[in-house]
Amino acid sequence: MSRHMPIAALAAIVLLAARPGLAADAKQMEDNKKAVAAFYDAVLNQKDFDAAAKYLGSRYTQHNPGAADGPEGLKGFIAFLKDKFPNNRSEIKRIFADGDYVIVHVHAVREPGTRGNAIIDIFKLENGKIVEHWDVVQPIPEKPANTNGMF
C-alpha cells in the first residue's frame, strides 16, 4: 500500500463532506439570480413597484449617486420611468452570481429606435432579498472604435 493512500482517502472524505454545502450554495445563487431577474423585470419593464417590493429586504441601500436611497427612492424612480420613458425596455444579456452578489449585463433602451445603454448592475442579497444596488451606465456610441459590440 502506498504511503500516499491515507492522504488521498482523507482528501476524498473532506471533499465529499463539503459537497452538500456546495450544492446548497449553488441553489441559493440560482435562487438569487431568479430573484434579481424578476425584480429587474418588475422595475424596468413592468414599472410596477408592488411587484418589485416583494424582492426587497428590510433595507435597500442605493449606491448610484443620482438615485434616492431606500424603497421610497425606488418607488420614485419607477414613477419617473412611467412618466418620462413609458416604453423603456431592459434586456438582461448575462447574469452572474457570486455568493450573495448578483451581477447583470443589460441592454436598456429608453426610447424605441435608439441605441440605448449598456448597463452593469450589481445587487447584494441577504436571505434571498435585495438589500443593496450599484450600477454603471455606458451609452452605446453611434460609431464605436471597434466592431466587437457591447453585448
Please annotate each region the language model reported.
Residues R19-F151:
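C-terminal and inter-domain tail/linker signature
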Residues M1-A8:
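Bacterial N-terminal signal peptides that target proteins for export
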Residues A12-L16:
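Hydrophobic alpha-helical segments of integral membrane proteins
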Residues A9-A11, G21:
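Cleavable N-terminal signal peptides
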